[in-house]
From Swiss-Prot:
Enzyme class per UniProt: lyase
Official protein name in the record: Imidazoleglycerol-phosphate dehydratase
Entry's localization field: Cytoplasm
E.C. no: 4.2.1.19
Recorded name of the encoding gene: hisB
Keyword tags: Amino-acid biosynthesis, Cytoplasm, Histidine biosynthesis, Lyase
Protein source organism: Methanopyrus kandleri (strain AV19 / DSM 6324 / JCM 9639 / NBRC 100938)
Amino acid sequence: MNSVRTADVKRTTKETEVEVSVNLDGSGRAKVDTGLPFFDHLLHQFAFHGRIDVEIKARGDLEVDDHHTVEDVGICLGKALNEALGDREGIRRIAWALVPMDEALVECAVDISGRPYFVLKGYRPRRNRIGSPPLSTENVSHFWKSFCDHAGVTMHVVVRWWDNDHHAIEAMFKAVGRALGAAKEIVGDGVPSTKGTLRRG
């Protein structure tokens, strides 16, 4: 079992420069600067509700679009989670959360299985963008898919009810944080799998 569950990931391309640090046994502190204020706010919610300490610094070609920045933050955060989880010994592995935010109600179930898969049901954005510089609402699902692909996590998110895009998306990040926060908790000994491993590949 890993005594310290932390990781640092860097990614540099012609489109972005991203640095991510995570501590899975933190208190939910976050220091985030992506150049997208609403995205920063969402990542703070994820960290706080997951009790994961997170530092994220990203610089991307926002003059083109927010897509590359959002995607690469998802890639790096997923890689960092995957690395910090180590051998997965003793984790709860499977967990879920149901989170209300005013009229919005969002459910998330996760399995730290080593098999990446992402499903989002019940949400079709009404607003194209939120914030300034704006986060494209269509990129929210792309962020979580990128995250799951590199974290080795299966995640199902169901937006049961919503009227306001901000509320639906924020409740989504809170629900994911709470579900992952519970799934990564150490609750026993050994790898919670009949295969004996939860690593990818």
